[in-house]
Amino acid sequence: LTTINKFFENSLNVSETSRQLYIHRNTLVYRLDKLQKSTGLDLRVFEDAITFKIALMVAKYMKYMESLDY
C-alpha cells in the first residue's frame, strides 16, 4: 500500500513516485501492472484510480466499524 499511497500523493505521476520511493521507474510500472492483473484496475487511468481509492476508503471505514463492535 505504500507504493499505491505514494502514487496517489503524486497525482498518478509515475516518474515522481518512483523517484520518491527510490526505485526504478520500471519497477513501479511492474508493480502497477501486477495490481492491474489482480484487480482489473489500471491506476494510471483516472477513473480506475478513483474506483480503487474509493474501495480503499470503504475498506478502511469497514475496519474502523469492526473495531467499534468489540
Per-range role (PLM):
Residues 1-70:
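Cytosolic nucleotide-utilizing catalytic cores of signal-transduction proteins
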